[in-house]
Every structure is written in C-alpha cells, then in structure tokens.
Amino acid sequence: MPTSTMPLDTKGADGTGSLPAVRAPRFNWTRGLVVLLTCVAIFLPLFLVFYQSFLTAPFFMPDKMLGLDAFRFIFDDPDFWLAFKNGMLLASGLAVIAVPLGGMLAFLMVRTDLPGRGWIAPLLLVPIFVSPMVMGFGYVVSMGPVGFYSTWVKDLVGFVPWNVYSFASIVVIAGLTHVPHVYLYASSALKSLGSDVEEAARVSGASPWQVMFNVSLPMIMPALAYAGVLVFFLGFEVFGLVLVLGDPEGHLVLATYLYKLTNKLGTPSYHLMAAVAVCLVAVTMPLVMLQRRLLKSANKYVSIKGKGARQKPLALGKWKWAALAVLGAWILVTIVLPLTGIVLRSFVEYWGEGVKLADVLTLQHFRDIFDQPSLVRGIVNTILIGVIGGALAVVCYTAIALAMHRKADGITRLLDYSVLVPRAVPGLLAGLSFLWVFLFVPSWLDGILRGMDNGLAMWLSEHAIPLLRQVRSTIFALWLAYSVVWLAYGMRLVSTSLLQVGPELEEAARAVGASRGRVTRDVTLPLIKFGMLGAWLMVFLIFEREYSTGVYLLSPGTEVIGAMLVSLWAGGSTDLVAALSFINITLVAIGLGIALRFGVKLHN
C-alpha cells in the first residue's frame, strides 16, 4: 500500500527558511565552584609536599634551592631502609592475618546458624571506630611487662609468655585489629550469594569448614582480593600502634620515621619530611588505583546463585562450639583485653607487681584532666568537630556527590579520580601538608600583594593576610584537614544514598519544567535526608577516633583528644593518657549507640 509523505517544514518562527538556533548549554557556576574548591583542597597540599621535597632547605629559608639533597639524605640513612623494610613486613603480615580470618568470620556470621549473631555483628566493628593510638595504649597497660593481665598471669605461671613490644607481636596485633575491614567486604559479598551450591556440598558430606574453604570463600575471591589490597595499603598507614608498641625496642615504620625526623636532627626538617612523604605516596597511590581497578573488575564476575538468591543458614552442628571458640578468641584478644586494660588503668592510681586493685582505685586522673584548660578544650573541640564538623563535612560531601550525580562527562571523571587521592595520603602526612598550606599560602599571597603598587593590595596585605595566618590556630584548620582526609569515605556514604533515588523521579520533575537546582532541592535532597543523617553519624564516629591528622596541627585552640594523646604519650603522662583514652572510648560508644538506635548500617 503506498505511503504518503509530508514535506518537512523547515521554516523558523519568523517565517524564514532558517532553522531555530541551537542554544548553547549554560555553564553551571555552582558546579564549577564545587569542582574548583574540591580540587584546590585536594591538590594544593599535595603539591606543596612535592615542592618541598625538591628543595634543599625548608621553604621559608632564604637560602633554599631546588635540588635532590633531601632524597639523597634519606636514601643514605639506614633507619629509612629499616623503616621501609618493616613497613613492607607489617603490611604483608597484616594481609596474611586479616584476610583469611576476616573471610572466616564473615562466613560464620552470614552463612551459618551461629548463635548470637545479632549482638556479635556490631561488636566485630569496634576496632574500626576505636583510635589505633587508644588500642596500642590498651595493649601496653593490659599485656605489657607490668600490665594488668601480664602480672596476673605471672603470678599464676611464674613468667609472662608474651612480649607485646616485639615486632612479631605488633604485626599480629595490627592484623587482628584490621580483621573488620576484610569482614565488611567479605560479608557484603556473601550476602549476595544463594546457598544452593553450599547445600549441595553439605549433602555430599562436606563439613562446614570444607564448605567454607572449598565453596563459599572461593566464590567471593574478587571481594577478598580487594580487601587484601586494602589492608596491605592500610599497613603503610599504621602509626599509633607502632608509635606506642614499637618505641621500647626501637621498631620503626615509614610513618613513625617521618614523625621522629625532627627529634633525630633537632630542627624542623621539612624538606626531609617531605621526601619521606613522597616515598610514602609513591607506595600507596598505586595501591589505591589497584583497589579501584579490582572494584571495577569484580563487577564482571558472575556469582553462582540459586533461584532468587535463596539463602538458608548452614547448620554448624557439632562445629558450633569450635566456631564460637574462634570468634570468642578474636573478640577477647582484639577488643576485651585492650579496652578493659584502659578502663582499669584510668581508675587506678598506679599499677605494678604486688599491687592490689582495691587499694589503688581513684578518680584523680579525671580531676587532673578537668584541671587543665588545654585538655578540657581538647574534649570540647573533639565533640564539636564530630557533631558540627561532621554535619558540615556531610554537606560538603553531598555537594561534591551532586556535582557528579547522573553526569557522565569529563568533570565527573576528574572528580571520581580526585576524591581517591586523599585516600593514598596517610593522616599524619595529610596533617603535615595542611600545616604547610597554612604556613606557605599566606606568605606567598603576601609577597604577591606587596609586589603590586596600589592601595588595595597594601590594605589586603596589612589586614587580610594576618587574618589568614591565624586560620592555622583555629578549629577550622583541623576540620578542613579531617574532611579532606576522609573525603573518599564520606563520598561513598552519600553516593550510596543517591544511587537509591530512581532517575524517573528526577526526570518527571524536569519534564514539568523544574530547573536542575529545583529538582535537587525539592526531589533529590528530601529523598536522601535519612541517608545524610546516617552519613553524619558515621562521620561523627570517624572524626572522634581520628588522631594522626591533628598531630602537626596541634596548637593552642586546636587541641583534640587524638592529637593530645600522641603529645601526652610522648611526654610520658601515662595517667592522663589512660583517662583521656577512656573519655574517647565513651564518646565513640555514645555515637555508636545512637547510630545503632537509628538503624544506621555500620557496614557502609
């Protein structure tokens, strides 16, 4: 049947034959500002670290020149290579311990009928939210040569059968405290699998342990590989544990070598510290990129599932008690011993052999804390940076996530890679780099302004620059460093909520004429408000336990518990460290309780 055709009307609205002009897309200034500020906050500190590493003296010295003297010095220093070797051993040992144990605990918690899983699950995540500095101190006062449990065991058997100061003990403790990181990824992968193959293995006579090692864990190998790279990378970030446990026998890793450079030379050796920092980033950055590659390639694996991914807990039977013994041993060594040691030490006047606990109970350590204004400020600042700073950080993370939301362009790819960069920078190094930002940028701007021969430049130099210099001594400096260090983590929390918003809701709003800004304000943000609340509580927990980022930013007005613990430990104030650690644990416990009460998914 013939079809009729109609001529295409190519006349424009003015009646001419020209087509209407295509309107050029408008530049989104809000998005541009978010991208600019994000890139400055990420790359400016890192640039200063690289710049300082290629100077022959600290950047504020007039005789500084470009050169490789800093790298020559550290490469000729035997302590650097000892720290590097120890760092490799620590990272490797950490992965060897944490990956199989984390996978095993995930299998027991997710795939079996292990009793008590409901209350055990949050307990497994405690080491993630307790500061490593606090954990290290907990092992000293509980299992050190004169620790509580060491003296009690010595009274029973006549000697202490362990040495927490040995490097092997440090590796074991670090491995055990990083098990939850592997557990999170392994349990998430196991929850997505059906149980048909496991049931078939059980029917054929396989024990629960054979099912775990031969069926379940091999099916989540991509997740275990990702977690393995993660904990290997985290091994190079370990600072607090080695600082506390490694000092008595002189064990160094790169982070503690960096921290002790000033003490070693007697003067602030910023160029040498920067060279060590560059070496650290050179190791960690490829690991972060490898993580990203593994995460993307993991999506290509197809897991064997039953119909509807049906899951049925495997009956442990007679193996139930063995499973509980493994789980109980990990909880005892990793959580109970160090934390109870801190609680006991914070309430006793002193401790040693032959001392009876009931005779030395006291509250004096807490009185001493509240008698010192700097420590009181540290507690208040820690709460403020967790509550208010955490909320502001989530707002910033949300703005960055919205700048990437459903926009598959070059800017999104730039941000996607940029937010991973801070993850490759250990907290100690990040704090140092921000210190240099607050020292260098005002001086650099002042030099530019003084070179301009006009009244406005001179006014800015005399009035604005002094205010800019004072930022270093404010809590804002610490908040900015914290927010950048935990950028990748915060982005993951917010992005998880954004991905749950169906695109059809936003498209419907756009179809009726709503602008992109109004869609965000009236549709997207209201739908993710509970996700943002959960993100705020999680960021609060992370900010409360953070310690290494504030070490180099510590000054009157910027005291926080984490940095004060490092300072007090260096000064030998064991009593104050114990009481302050107890306060820090209490704050984390309160935040954790609130998060659980509101149903926040801690596995995020």
Segment roles from a protein language model:
Residues 63-64, 141, 240-267, 354-359, ...:
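Glycine-rich helix-loop "coupling/hinge" segments at transmembrane-helix boundaries
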Residues 197, 299-311, 505, 514, ...:
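Short cytosolic juxtamembrane segments of multi-pass membrane proteins
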Residues 15-23, 290-326:
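Alpha-helical transmembrane segments of integral membrane proteins
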Residues 1-19:
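Short, intrinsically disordered terminal tails adjacent to the first/last structured region
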